Design a protein with these regions (language model features):
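Bacterial N-terminal signal peptides that target proteins for export
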Residues: 1-9
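Secretory targeting and sorting signals
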Residues: 13-15
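C-terminal motif of bacterial Sec signal peptides marking the signal peptidase cleavage site
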Residues: 18-20
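Bacterial signal peptide processing site
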Residues: 22-24
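Non-catalytic cap/lid and distal C-terminal segments of serine-dependent acyl enzymes
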Residues: 27-333
């Protein structure tokens, strides 16, 4: 089956009525066709976290605070400033080994520390348990912040700060973290970061998802995997992914086609809960992108939903439990 025929079938299927699962449990999945000829759903239900993964593991990773120098990328002054990020290091971190790495951005009214603190440290416990059970290789997780001091009073007003964070990551935080800790980056200049992008992911919740879409738009050369949770792309304006899904899809498709990463050079693992206030925001955009099947299809984009989940931190560990083994499958070593 040729790629053109695959794309045609994919687009034809997406033109059919789509019913997503809702709080009442009714729904269906729209099938799409992958390059290998297998049926792959665009919309997927998340798998629940196994019992016991919310408990402290015998072997626990550590959290390190990093205060680093950066500058104003958002307000246009270019003035020097400092920011803070937190780094999860797996138990037994070995400076001689290479580690995959995820940068995960908090939602509004939260901080860089929130991801590792909320729900009694649920994300830390999850990472420890996933590593202990062999679901993933030991990996590093970094939680940065887009806040310049206190969060803006209106979450939507954080837009310019969310847009600025990917540049801050690439220019300032990634070089610090990945020169201090051993990832797959042989160097932390632009060339070294791009050469190691297959082992780097970025994700975020709510306004962190908006940040993730900006990273896809503006720093595709630095990350291969993208995990926007409950937030749409604002590159064409606030809530444009929801309100202008086809325009947003066309814009992002052009950005991909201008890069060397079209096809399988990236993966978007989007997610939300069926009772999440931002569910339609991100799903409408994903459906718009899926209509451009020559650029966005099951080989590089899927949507994952948790039945009944709301717009809160509580389901984040389940999204991570489902996404991380996909980004970074367990090695045979």
């Amino acid at each position: 089956m040729t790629r053109n025929l695959i794309s045609f079938i994919y687009a034809l299927l997406l033109s059919l009525p789509l019913t997503s699962c809702n709080a009442n449990g009714a729904g269906s999945e729209t099938p799409v066709i992958s390059d290998n000829g297998e049926n792959t759903p665009l919309i997927n239900e998340t798998r629940p976290i196994p019992d016991g993964y919310g408990q402290d593991a015998n072997e626990q990773g550590s959290i390190v605070r990093i205060d680093y120098d950066t500058r104003d990328y958002a307000e246009g002054t270019g003035m020097a400033r400092t920011n803070t990020a937190y780094v999860y290091l797996p138990y037994g971190y070995d400076a001689q080994k290479q580690y995959n790495i995820l940068y995960f951005v908090h939602g509004h009214y939260s901080t860089a520390a929130s991801t590792f603190e909320d729900e009694d440290g649920a994300v830390c416990k999850l990472l420890d348990q996933m590593i202990a059970h062999g679901d993933i290789d030991p990996m590093i997780v970094v939680t940065p912040s887009y806040n310049y001091g206190q969060p803006t009073s209106n979450y939507a007003d954080a837009d310019p700060y969310c847009r600025a964070l990917p540049q801050e990551l690439v220019n300032d935080l990634i070089p610090i973290v990945e020169s201090r800790y051993h990832t797959y980056a042989k160097t932390t200049d632009t060339e070294g970061i791009e050469a190691s992008r297959d082992h780097r992911a970025i994700g975020g919740f709510s306004m962190g998802a908006v940040t993730t879409w900006y990273a896809f738009d503006e720093t595709l050369n630095a990350f291969r995997y993208f995990m926007p949770v409950s937030g749409d792309c604002w590159s064409l304006g606030r809530f444009a992914g929801m309100n202008r899904p086809d325009d947003t899809a066309a814009y992002l498709a052009e950005r991909v086609q201008q890069s060397p990463y079209a096809g399988n050079g990236f993966y978007i693992w989007a997610a939300s809960g069926t009772n999440d206030s931002a569910y339609s925001e991100i799903l409408l955009q994903i459906e718009g992108m899926a209509r451009l099947a020559d650029v966005f299809n099951a080989t590089n984009m899927t949507f994952h939903q948790k039945e009944g989940a709301r717009h809160e931190f509580r389901p984040i560990p389940e999204y991570l439990y489902n996404a991380l083994p996909f980004f970074f499958p367990k090695s045979n070593e």
